[in-house]
Amino acid sequence: MSDSTPTEAAVAESNTAGNEATTNSDKASPETTTTSTTEPGNTAKTAAAERMARFRALQARAKTSSDQNLKAATAESRREASDPSQLTALHRRHAIASHKILKADVEESGGDFERKRAWDWTAEESERWDKRVKKKEAARDNNAFQDYRHEAEKIYKRQLKNMPPDMERYAKDKMAAIDKAAAAGTLDIVETEDGELIAVDRAGTFYSTTDSTDFAKNKPDKEAIDRLVNDMKKAEDVAAKKRKARMAKNGEDDDVTYINDKNKQFNQKLARFYNKYTAEIRESFERGTMI
C-alpha cells in the first residue's frame, strides 16, 4: 500500500496539471483569435492612408508643373511678340532724346555741355572712347568695295573678332611644352627666394623664331573643327541668300545663262534680235525631239 500511494499521487498531479493547461489554452485562444483579426484591419488602413498621401503628393506635383508650364508659355509668347530690333531702336531713340534734352538745358543755363559731360569720365576712359569712335568712323568710311584683297582682309578681321581666344587650352599647351623642354634638358626650372618657379631658356631654343615650324604640328580639337565647319556653312548660306535676293531683284528666276554682267548684257542683246527665230529650236532641244 505504501508503494502504490506515491504513484497515485503523481497521476493525480499530472491530471490536475493537464486540466489547468487545457483551461489556460481555452482562455488564451479567444485573445489570439482577436489579435489575428485586428492586425489585418490596421494594415489595410495604413496602406490606404499611404496611397492617399502619395496620390495627394502627385496631385500637388502635377499642379506645380502645370503652373510652371503656363508661366513659361506666357513668357515665351511675350518674348516672341516683342521684336528685339524694335526694342533696341527704341532704347537708342530714348538715349538720343535724353542727350539732346540735357544739352539744351545746359546751353540754356549758359554752361559748357561737353565740359560738364566730361566730369563723369576719367582721362583714360575719354581717350579710349575717342579711339573707339575714330576706329568706328574709319570702318564706316572704309565700307565700300576696293579690291578682293582688301575685302578678304576685312572678312578675316571680322572672323578674328568673333573668335575668342581659348586661354585654358593655351595654358595647358604651354605647361606641356615647358614640361617637355625641361625633361629634354633645354629648359631649366629655377626656384627664387620667394618660392616662385621660373623657367630659364639657357640654350635659346624654347621660344619660336621665324624659322620655327612647330605650328605645323598643331592638331586642332574637335570643337575647333566643328566651329570651322559651321562658319563655312554660314558663309555658304549667306552667299546663296545674297545671290537669290539679287536674282529676285533683277527678275531672274530662271536658269543663269551668263558668267558676268557683260556677258549678261550680250545675251540680252542676242535675245532681243534672235529669240523669235530660235524659240522653236530651243523648245525642241528642251523636249529632246530635235535629236
From Swiss-Prot:
GO biological process: mRNA processing; RNA splicing
Region (Disordered): 1-89
Compartment list: Nucleus
InterPro entries reported in the protein's UniProt record: mRNA_splic_SYF2
Assembly and interaction partners: Associated with the spliceosome.
Gene: SYF2
Top-rank taxon: Eukaryota
Biased composition (Polar residues): 1-27, 62-71
A single Gene Ontology CC term: Prp19 complex
PANTHER family referenced in this protein's UniProt entry, alphabetically: GCIP-INTERACTING PROTEIN P29, PRE-MRNA-SPLICING FACTOR SYF2
Similarity comment: family membership: Belongs to the SYF2 family.
Name the record gives this protein: Pre-mRNA-splicing factor SYF2
General function of this protein: Involved in pre-mRNA splicing.
Residue stretches of biased makeup (Low complexity): 30-40
Stretches assigned to coiled coil: none
Keywords: mRNA processing, mRNA splicing, Nucleus, Spliceosome
